[in-house]
């Protein structure tokens, strides 16, 4: 399968799809800062200085004027319409053919098992519950996109192999498995964090060591970086270790990776160059990006053969982080990954992952909507035990009844952008019908509450 990988999106979709179609990709994955703004009232849900807020391209995919020509999946970053994404904590369609992976999730796409987690790490909020709600105050606007231990623990309980792991943040220590000298020449202000072993997320470091996916894709730090992690050299302490044989100048050693494309495509002017400063050790880099001109795409292609199943002694993770959509930046790659199961021709078939559904059922009693995580989270071994019990329910009620297919049930909640909606209007809180349907499907909610009706499109012409 030809997988297009995009770094930070920042609301630029039209030109991205032009590029992805030219590259004939089967699937597009985006590493966050997607900015699914439906109308200008969603500005109140995004953490960003007002002068950099712009509606972007997404609203025309939400209102139906445009449709994504390629199946697109993404995780959330630290610049998102958090009020919209919060309607879909388990994931769901934000527009036709554009799928958000939720706070954390695993799905199967065309035979590839893809896991993902949204947000960035903050020690201050990591152990908190999900207490945020509209209208957001300044603190909530930050904390809502911070990764929680609940989601990391849920993912750590996975035991089946992962093909692709998608995150916004980098796993801490990953730079030691690539060309760290080159990274520091390009981003010298990372040096102190590298020396402190503080570049990236310690929570994602734990996930990388625990899950050992074939590929890990990320964004956030606005630079291209590749690395290869040999897990046989890792200590069993949840941390990345590094030996001299791990560090290479090339990271990915695939042919064609460093061959730039000669294509030129127009790109919208980028108005979201600066980070809203919050003390997070990685967000300050966004201040550096100010150049605006015609885009020269630096698309690379990685070709790889189908890899055999690896034993725990020789597992390898190939890491790829990409830049954001700006001229002369390496923000897009095409990676060819052969699925374990070859899908039928046509659009990749999407399914819920049975193991992940078991995890959701096992972890449901521990969901917290208060600032303190209440009830306390169980140990990883307890979660795995609970998951094994829930696997029986999932197998009997979903797998054997062929109910794992992800429905194409996108539904507008907030009204699409129009002149009647102004920037000073606070967004409303909505119960998304997709979330209700999903909770009913996996047995977290009884079918007793009617889903809210779809929002009528104000631009629709009634004959």
From Swiss-Prot:
Q: How is the cofactor bound?
A: Binds 2 divalent metal cations.
- Give the UniProt family note: Belongs to the lariat debranching enzyme family.
Protein's UniProt name: Lariat debranching enzyme
Give a GO cellular-component term: nucleus
Q: How is its activity regulated?
A: Active in presence of diverse metals including Fe(2+), Zn(2+) and Mn(2+). Binds two metal cations in two adjacent alpha and beta metal-binding pockets.
Q: Which residues form the signal peptide?
A: none
* Pfam families for the chain: DBR1, Metallophos
Residues bound to a divalent metal cation 1 are: 8, 10, 222
The cofactors named for this UniProt entry are: Fe(2+); Zn(2+); Mn(2+)
EC numbers, comma separated: 3.1.4.-
Group of enzyme by EC: hydrolase
User: Which cellular compartments is it found in?
Assistant: Nucleus; Cytoplasm
What GO MF terms are annotated? Answer: metal ion binding; RNA lariat debranching enzyme activity
Binding positions (a divalent metal cation 2):
33, 78, 168, 220
**Location of region: Disordered:** 250-324
The record's keywords, sorted A to Z, are: Cytoplasm, Hydrolase, Iron, Manganese, Metal-binding, mRNA processing, Nucleus, Zinc
Annotated spans, Lariat recognition loop: 118-148
Renumbered to this chain, the Basic and acidic residues biased-composition regions fall at 276-289, 299-323
Name the predominant localization.
nucleus
Keyword Transferase found: no
Write out the function statement from the record: Cleaves the 2'-5' phosphodiester linkage at the branch point of lariat intron pre-mRNAs after splicing and converts them into linear molecules that are subsequently degraded, thereby facilitating ribonucleotide turnover.
């Amino acid at each position: 399968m030809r997988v297009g990988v995009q770094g930070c999106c920042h609301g630029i979709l039209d030109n991205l799809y032009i590029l992805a179609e030219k590259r004939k990709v089967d699937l597009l994955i985006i590493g966050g800062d997607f900015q699914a703004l439906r109308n200008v009232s969603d500005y109140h849900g995004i953490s960003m200085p007002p002068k950099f807020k712009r509606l972007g391209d997404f609203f025309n995919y939400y209102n139906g004027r445009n449709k994504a020509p390629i199946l697109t999946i993404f995780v959330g970053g630290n610049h998102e319409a958090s009020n919209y994404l919060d309607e879909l904590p388990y994931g769901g369609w934000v527009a036709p053919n554009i799928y958000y992976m939720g706070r954390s999730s695993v799905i199967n796409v065309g035979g590839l098992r893809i896991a993902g987690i949204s947000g960035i790490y903050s020690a201050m909020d990591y152990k908190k519950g999900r207490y945020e709600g509209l209208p957001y105050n300044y603190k909530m606007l930050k904390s809502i996109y911070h990764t929680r231990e609940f989601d990391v623990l849920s993912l750590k309980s996975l035991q089946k192999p992962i093909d692709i792991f998608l995150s916004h943040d980098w796993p801490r220590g990953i730079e030691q498995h690539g060309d760290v000298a080159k990274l520091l020449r390009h981003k010298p202000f990372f040096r102190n964090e590298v020396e402190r072993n503080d570049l990236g997320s310690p929570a994602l470091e734990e996930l990388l060591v625990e899950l050992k996916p074939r590929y890990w894709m990320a964004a956030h730090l606005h630079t291209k970086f590749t690395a290869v992690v040999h897990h046989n050299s890792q200590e069993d302490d949840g941390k990345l270790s590094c030996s001299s044989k791990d560090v290479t100048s090339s990271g990915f050693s695939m042919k064609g990776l460093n061959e730039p494309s000669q294509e030129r495509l127009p790109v919208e002017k980028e108005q979201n160059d600066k980070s809203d400063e919050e003390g997070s050790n990685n967000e300050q880099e966004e201040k550096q990006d100010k150049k605006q001109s015609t885009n020269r795409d630096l698309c690379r292609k990685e070709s790889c053969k189908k890899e055999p199943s690896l034993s725990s002694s020789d597992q390898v993770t190939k890491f790829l982080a990409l830049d954001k959509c700006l001229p002369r930046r390496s923000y897009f790659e095409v990676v060819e990954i052969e699925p374990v199961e070859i899908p039928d021709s046509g659009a990749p078939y999407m399914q819920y992952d049975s193991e992940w559904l078991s995890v959701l059922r096992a972890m449901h009693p521990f969901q917290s909507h208060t600032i303190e995580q209440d009830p306390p989270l169980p140990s990883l071994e307890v979660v795995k035990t609970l998951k094994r019990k829930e696997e029986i329910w999932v197998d009997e009620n979903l797998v054997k009844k062929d109910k794992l297919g992800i429905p194409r049930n996108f539904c507008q909640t907030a009204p699409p952008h129009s002149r009647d909606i102004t920037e000073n209007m606070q967004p409303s809180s909505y119960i998304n019908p997709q979330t209700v349907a999903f909770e009913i499907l996996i047995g977290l909610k009884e079918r007793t509450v009617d889903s809210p009706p779809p929002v009528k499109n104000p631009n629709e012409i009634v004959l």
